[in-house]
Design a protein with these regions (language model features):
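Generic N-terminal targeting/processing segments that precede catalytic cores or assembly contacts
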Residues: 1-99, 118-123, 229-231, 238-279
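Hydrophobic faces of stable alpha-helices that mediate helix-helix packing
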Residues: 35, 80, 84, 134, ...
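Alpha-helix capping and helix-loop boundary segments enriched in small/acidic/polar residues
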Residues: 74, 78, 103-106, 128, ...
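Glycine-rich anion/phosphate-binding loop at the beta-strand->alpha-helix junction
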Residues: 85-197
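Functionally critical mobile loop/hinge segments
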Residues: 172-279
Length: 279
């Protein structure tokens, strides 16, 4: 990322300029399709009810969560619950074999989509602006993929939820008119505070703890953006994005096999649910 920032400085580009000056012209149309798919996945998830497939017997929550948000008087809490309901909606669609966008993976598909949905339908941000935000988020996701991993089986959940939170924080920072260094700072914060997160899905399903982690992840992305926006005016960040990505890779290599998508340890072994065999 440091090299990309240097190119941007040299050419007086922002991250959007960098992406579209280095990618095929069809990328914009592709990202437009991605945005549409994200928005539709939230819509479907908010309208669906019933039990998620598999042995866990988990009820869908997104619809009721969204309806509950409408009765919350505290604006701050209403915002949080509403945004989390969007993340639940997409993650529950994924758990039900619905069409979602891997951003960057299925296990973390609800974070960026939830934020895009909120900004489009609740905040009235234009499609063009959101497509540009996807380009920025995707840039950070690709750096993670190239220099480390986005696979829970390789790096634990820090590589999935952590990367998705990072991409969303970067997109959010762009949408809030933060500069290049502030965007990098937001992405770094988002990844740094997911370091060491294990991947231990109960029963092997992308349900527990995955769905709830998407809801928490989108809130963390907003927090990372906000912290960057104001802390960057107080002090210079000591840890840069490249450093935290290298650290994530190292941490993932040190995580035991039991905590990297195998369901052989962690919550997958501790949570007892009827129909799930821990042997």
């Amino acid at each position: 990322m440091s090299e990309i920032i240097e190119v941007c400085k040299k050419n007086q580009w922002n991250f959007v300029d960098y992406v579209f000056n280095n990618e095929d012209k069809e990328l914009y149309n592709y990202l437009s399709k991605i945005l549409s798919a994200m928005l539709e996945s939230v819509k479907r998830g908010l309208s669906a009810s019933g039990v998620l497939p598999g042995k866990l017997g988990i009820e869908r929550c997104a619809k009721n969560m969204y309806l509950k948000s409408k009765s919350i008087e505290d604006d701050h809490e209403e915002f949080k619950v509403r945004l989390m309901s969007y993340a639940y909606a997409v993650s529950e669609e994924n758990a039900s074999n619905g069409e979602v966008v891997t951003a960057p993976t299925l296990g973390a598909c609800g974070i960026l989509a939830a934020y895009m949905y909120m900004m489009y339908y609740d905040e009235g941000v234009s499609r063009r602006k959101l497509i540009n935000a996807l380009a920025v988020g995707g840039l950070f996701g690709n750096v993670i993929k190239h220099n480390a991993t986005i696979s829970g089986a390789v790096g634990g959940c820090q590589a999935e939820i952590g990367a998705a939170c990072c991409m969303t924080a970067a997109a959010a920072a762009y949408l809030n008119d933060l500069n290049i260094k502030q965007i990098e700072y937001a992405a770094e914060i988002a990844m740094e505070h997911h370091l060491g997160l294990t991947c231990d899905p109960v029963g092997g399903y992308v349900i527990i703890p995955c769905i709830e982690r998407n809801a928490v992840g989108v809130l963390r992305a907003v927090d990372a953006m906000t912290l960057s926006k104001y802390m960057s005016k107080i002090k210079e960040n000591v840890v840069n994005f490249d450093t935290v990505v290298r650290t994530m890779k190292y941490t993932g290599q040190k995580l035991p096999l039991e905590l990297k998508e195998t369901s052989l340890g962690g919550l997958a072994q501790e949570v007892s649910i009827k129909g799930v065999d821990h042997d």
